[in-house]
Amino acid sequence: THSAAKPSSAEPTRRLAVSQTPPLVHGVVPLSREMPPQNLMPVPDKPGTWTPPYEEPAWIAIWQNRKFDIVVLVIGLAVLSFVLIFQDWLARHPTALTRLRNGFHVYTLFFIGWWGLAQLSVINVLTFVGSVMQGFRWENFLIDPMLFILWGFVAVTLLLWGRGVYCGWLCPFGALQELILLAARRLKLPEMEFSDAVHERLVALKYIILILLFGLSLQSIVDAASYAEVEPFKTVISMRFQREWHYVAYAVALIGIAAINRKFYCKYLCPLGAALSIPGRFRLFEWWLRRRKECGKPCQVCAHQCSVRAIRPTGEINAN
């Protein structure tokens, strides 16, 4: 029989255990077989002294590989923060503000959307709620750096200014609708708006959709995700229209309607907007839209200027 190799004097003495059963010879384990090193694993002399090697979380490598995306996103959010903080000064220069806003929509659509694939979704909200209820783990949300940073920024701005920051500036599909509307105005396409009575009733649709999706998510997030295709985001942003024809037809129809009815989908069908409006009602600051005694009566400037009809005739903000 061959004797086992003696351990090197430079290494601490330790026992070796067989990690794999050696092959049988005529149904018998040969006693004289010398086990190859790859079939052996170290066993600690004292129980509980061996610890597995440290493995770096996967999300760290992903963040390191996407440094460029992270830097460009942070710069964009810094520019938007400047706009929000100095909005009174920018409002005195409407032409410059309009150009800045249009340029930011291009950035949102092409970089945040089609390049970074950072289109937020109602499924993100439902997944977060489910995670809180069943056991929250940061690793599940850190895996995509752009989504994580964007959601963090949106959470802060929701409390400060409401959901208008995301819906009006950072939503890639919303930016696409704004750019489509801009092209439609230059082509002098007709505008179509519903009456106030019809508008107020249609607004309720997105809340009904949100409630239904939330109920489904309690049973199965997979089922909720399939019905969340009411959002055209996956078709337009994530897959760039490379899908089955009925998904593409639905998305194109919504974009076409947006050319004559500004942000139709956002106003009436978007469950993400409905979800964001709930915490947005508790924003800390009202000074970003100052009220005066003339607001609503007789002045109707804000109500007429706001093309998404977020200002009531009374001059109050319509959080819906």
Q: What role is predicted for each listed range?
A:
Residues 319-320:
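Long, low-complexity, intrinsically disordered cytosolic termini of multi-pass membrane proteins
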Residues 1-2, 6-316:
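Non-ligating segments of multi-cofactor redox enzymes
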